[in-house]
Amino acid sequence: MAAVVAKREGPPFISEAAVRGNAAVLDYCRTSVSALSGATAGILGLTGLYGFIFYLLASILLSLLLILKARRRWNKYFKSRRPLFTGGLIGGLFTYVLFWTFLYGMVHVY
């Protein structure tokens, strides 16, 4: 009798250390883009809702760039696609507001 071997979809082994490392890189990217976009919003003088819309656009752009970079092999680097869209989003918002208000104050107030 011939043994039937079922093929598994996805990677055969997922290293937890690699997944944590990828999450750390994703968090670093999100924090860096948040700081850069916050500084840009502050220099441009965006206030109120326009500033938060700018953050959402920057976050969406980063997520799209990460998806384009990973292409169809996202499951090789992450367990699901959700971290690519939502990973570090709230922490990035705090960084964004910090840089936004600091540079707005430095450029437009003083």
From Swiss-Prot:
Membrane topology term: Multi-pass membrane protein
Protein's name in the database: ER membrane protein complex subunit 6
Cytoplasmic side: 2-28, 72-89
Function: Part of the endoplasmic reticulum membrane protein complex (EMC) that enables the energy-independent insertion into endoplasmic reticulum membranes of newly synthesized membrane proteins. Preferentially accommodates proteins with transmembrane domains that are weakly hydrophobic or contain destabilizing features such as charged and aromatic residues. Involved in the cotranslational insertion of multi-pass membrane proteins in which stop-transfer membrane-anchor sequences become ER membrane spanning helices.
Quaternary structure (record): Component of the ER membrane protein complex (EMC).
Subcellular location: Endoplasmic reticulum membrane
One Pfam family named in its UniProt record: EMC6
Single GO cellular component term: EMC complex
Lumenal topological domain: 45-50, 107-110
Family: Belongs to the EMC6 family.
A biological process from GO: tail-anchored membrane protein insertion into ER membrane
Chief site of localization: endoplasmic reticulum
Organism: Bos taurus
Gene, per the UniProt record: EMC6
Spans traversing the lipid bilayer: 29-44, 51-71, 90-106
Record PTM N-acetylalanine, positions in chain: A2
Keyword Magnesium: no
Keywords: Acetylation, Endoplasmic reticulum, Membrane, Transmembrane, Transmembrane helix
